[in-house]
Amino acid sequence: MSIDKISMERIAQIILPVHFRTAEPVLILGEPGIGKTEIVLKSVRSLLTEAYGGSKPKAKKSKKTFEEEMNAALAETDEAEAEEVEAKKAKKVVFNVEDYYTIIDGSGMPSESLVIPYIDNDNVDRLQRDVIPEFKKAKAFFDKKENDGKKFIIVIDELSSFTQDDQRTIMNFIQSGLLPDGTFLPNDRLWVISMGNPPRSIPGFEESDSPTHDIESAVITRCATYFVEADLKGWLAWGAQSNDKGQTNLHPYLLSALMKLPELYNVKDREDVRYLINRSGYKLSQYLYEVEKMKEEGLDAKWNQIAVNSYVGSKIGTTLASTLEQLDKLISVKELFGSDKDDKIDPKMMNKFRDLEPFERYYLLMKCLEDSSPVNYKKDNNILKLSQLVREGQLPVETGKAMAHFILENRKNKGSNASILMDNKTLMKGGDYNVAAVIMDFQDQFRGIK
C-alpha cells in the first residue's frame, strides 16, 4: 500500500487554516518544483491578514444564482472600500504581514548554521552562541506588547537540506520553542511549517532523484506530516489568475498548450534531467512573456526551440514547440474584435473562431481578458462582442470556467479589465446580459461536470 498524497491546493484550502488555529507544527514533503513554497507562503500571508489585518474570513460558498454571486462580489468590494476609509479616519497603524512570519531556507544554509558562535570578552564563558536573524525576528515579535495573544509563523523551507544535527535543533524548537541560544519562545503562539523533499527511504518516493538528508523520525513524529503530489489542475488554476502586471501568472501559450496536452506535465525522461513541472514551467512562461515584450518594443524577437528545451527537456520541448508554433499563426485579438465602432464580430471572423481547436479558442479569449489586451472594454461595443464570443463561440467547459474564475478573482484590481467587465451594467437593459453573467450562465449549464 502506497502512502496517501494530497495536492498543495487542498492543503492550502482545508489543512493549513485548521493547523493555524491550533499552532500545531506541520511538515509537507514532496518532489521539488511542484509549488510547495509559493503556495504555503501565499496561504500564510492570507491567514495572517484575515486574523490580524482587519479583513474578515470568507464564508463557505453555497450554490448561488448569478445575481446572488454578482451582488455578493459587489458587496464585498464595497465593504473592503468602507473598511479602508474607516482605517484612514482612525489613523490606524498600517498592518504589514511581513512582520508576522519569517522564512528559513535550508538550501542556502552552510552545515550546522542555526547557531552562530561569537566571542564575548565581558562574559566568564567567552565563547557564546547567537541565533540566526530569522530567530531574532521571532524573538523581537514576542517582545512587543502589541503582539500579545498573536501568533508568529516560522516557515522552514528545504528541511531535507539540513544536516541531522541541525534537524535535532529544529526538533527541540518545534517541541518546546527552545532556541539554540537557550531562550524559549511561547510555543502556543508559535506555528512552524516545514517543507522538504522526501528521501528515497520513504515508500512511494523510491525513484526520487532529489538530493536530500534523511529526515529525522523525531521531527516527523512531532508534526502533522503530509505528502504532496504534482497537481496540474491546481497549477493551471493559479496560472490563469492575473498578476500585478495585469498578465496571467502563466503565459497563455503555456496554459493553452497544457490544456491540449496535459500528458506533458511532470513526465521524467531517463535520457534527460529536465522536465516540465511548476518551477520550470513558470520560468519558461517568463521567457515567453519577455519575447512578447521585445516584439511590442519593435525588436525582432521570436521564441527559440532550444530555449524551450532548456527549461523542459528536448523530448517535451519538441512536442510543446509544435503547439506554440500553431498558436503563433492564429488570428490576433485585434483582428478578431475589429473596429470599436462595430457591435458584432464580423461573420467571417466568427466562423474562423469557431473552426479553431478548443485550446486555440481558450488562448484567444484569455488574451482578450488580460489588461495588456488591445481591446478597450470601456467601449460597450467591445463588451457586446466578448459576450457574443462566449454565447456563440462553442466554448469548451474549461474555457468558461477559466474566464469566470479570472474575472471573479481579479475584479478588485481597480481599472483592470476584470473590474470593468464586472461593473458594466449597460448590457442588462432589454433583457440582455452583462458579459460576466453570460459566462456564469454558461457555467450553470455544466455545473457538476468536471
What is the meaning of each model-derived region?
Residues 1-450:
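C-terminal regulatory/interaction module of P-loop NTP-utilizing enzymes
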